[in-house]
Amino acid sequence: MSSISLKENGGEVSVKKDYSNGGGVRDLYGEDSATEDHLITPWTFSVASGCSLLRDPRYNKGLAFTEGERDAHYLRGLLPPSVFNQELQEKRLMHNLRQYEVPLHRYMALMDLQERNERLFYKLLIDNVAELLPVVYTPTVGEACQKYGSIFRRPQGLYISLKEKGKILEVLKNWPEKSIQVIVVTDGERILGLGDLGCQGMGIPVGKLSLYTALGGVRPSSCLPVTIDVGTNNEKLLNDEFYIGLRQRRATGQEYATFLDEFMRAVKQNYGEKVLVQFEDFANHNAFDLLEKYSSSHLVFNDDIQGTASVVLAGLLASLKLVGGTLADHTFLFLGAGEAGTGIAELIAVEVSKQTKAPVEETRKKIWLVDSKGLIVSSRLESLQQFKKPWAHEHEPVKGLLEAVKAIKPTVLIGSSGAGKTFTKEVVETMASLNEKPLILALSNPTSQSECTAEEAYTWSKGRAIFASGSPFDPVEYEGKLFVPGQANNAYIFPGFGLGLIMSGAIRVRDEMLLAASEALAAQVSEENYDKGLIYPPFTNIRKISANIAAKVAAKAYDLGLASHLKRPKDLVKYAESCMYSPGYRSYR
């Protein structure tokens, strides 16, 4: 005999085994004998026990299953006999991670962990945030996106391509989780400072949402990473046999706008008015248009424009204790007039307007921007993109950054250009000659694209610069003094900002909320931090920081009448802390 027969006997199924076919068993469902042309049914069973429990990252605890749980859930023999607690598992994993010398290998190991044991992944990230943040996000995530086609294992988010035009609502319904509160979406056109990575930009939404959970306490099941694939103009990817996206040039114009509009309408229809949609790494020309178009009808947030602006403003507010004066006393010069540069500039102008009661049009006049063609001045007005026009001030044309520094005499120099090594020795020395304590922010990511390094800023300014960067740099010793460079990382703001919107049930984002987040972050900088030259608090207290930011954002939502969760909690900080996801293991019956 060479088959298994199933017979019903009094309502029960009995199995007659047949091992005559080489010790094997009969292919009951036809999978083994099926050809590609032969359709089969993909049977699945959803009983959370045995192997299925071990393979479900939401419930798997690995060696932390207790003796009782192993008996109750048919795990005997499927695990080694030792029982570890979560702390020992964490210790073992951190030991293993530290053996990897290549950051990308650490990234891949962490993504593997996330796919097999969700709670242990977040426990690891929360407890070791300063060490692991550069791995799960900038700068390592940039390299991961560049090589995403080669290291791709399994989908971690939702891919919506032009193939799904007219069916986006159906695609959203394919996602297994239904109570979505935060969506991070990219079209992959401007990934960090790396350019068009197309569909491989998925690493950015995945990384951002892991930080929403680890740093802001938003439940993983409430987060949805989305990549909108409208093609890519990256010839290298189009010719790469391992590229995982559409092999066509990018859709533009009306086709692009219609597709994005279908996505936004489907999101609102499927998840409701209060789902937060965070636009991530869109090209400048689309980022501003999308934010302007949907800010009045959806709960939308652009981290590159608004998140960066909020975290930089927080650093500027904190730095006043070191450099003196008020924000209105300073003159700002930006290298880079894209999403980040203009977004930061506008929020600074709004904050100065709030402090001085002067019109925003007036407060913009002490903020100057340099783009690829030089200083943005009124004589260039006709040729400027719309979002640059508010920054075209009266001044003779100036071509280079060094010439602009000499002409404008800024007290604050901010780089958001995505062009590395542009804060040259001459530029930094000129800033130091103009100011006792020049404030220099080199914000571009990843590290290779930073306008200057921390060591260069401190050395060229003879230890007088107040420095912060977008990517992490090691502490620098200069003439016997240790300088700890701050990182103007958006991760300070967006997790707490998102939590504040969620816990208040906010239906729209307003500038007042961004200002509240900046002020809350600046207030967390301690005297000890200032003594080290820091203008940002350490990441070790990030959940406390996020709770305070969330409370201020929620309070502003209630004040503006934009909160839908009534009634208002008395202690918003405690309420924020109570809303946060905890990654500790749960006990199973």
From Swiss-Prot:
Highest taxon, organism lineage: Eukaryota
Induction entry: By fungal elicitor.
Enzyme nomenclature, EC number: 1.1.1.40
Binding residue positions for a divalent metal cation: 280-281, 304
Signal peptide span: none
A GO biological process held by the record: malate metabolic process
Catalytic activity: (S)-malate + NADP(+) = pyruvate + CO2 + NADPH; oxaloacetate + H(+) = pyruvate + CO2
Residues forming the catalytic site: 137, 208
Gene3D superfamilies in UniProt: Malic enzyme, N-terminal domain (3.40.50.10380), NAD(P)-binding Rossmann-like Domain (3.40.50.720)
Cofactor: Mg(2+); Mn(2+)
Site (Important for activity): 304
Positions that bind NADP(+): 333-349
Pfam families found in the cross-reference section: malic (PF00390), Malic_M (PF03949)
UniProt-annotated location(s): Cytoplasm
Cofactor-binding details, from the entry: Divalent metal cations. Prefers magnesium or manganese.
CDD domains (UniProt xref): NAD_bind_1_malic_enz
GO molecular function, one term: malate dehydrogenase (decarboxylating) (NADP+) activity
Record keywords, A-Z: Cytoplasm, Metal-binding, NADP, Oxidoreductase
Family, per entry: Belongs to the malic enzymes family.
Protein name: NADP-dependent malic enzyme
Higher taxonomy: Eukaryota, Viridiplantae, Streptophyta, Embryophyta, Tracheophyta
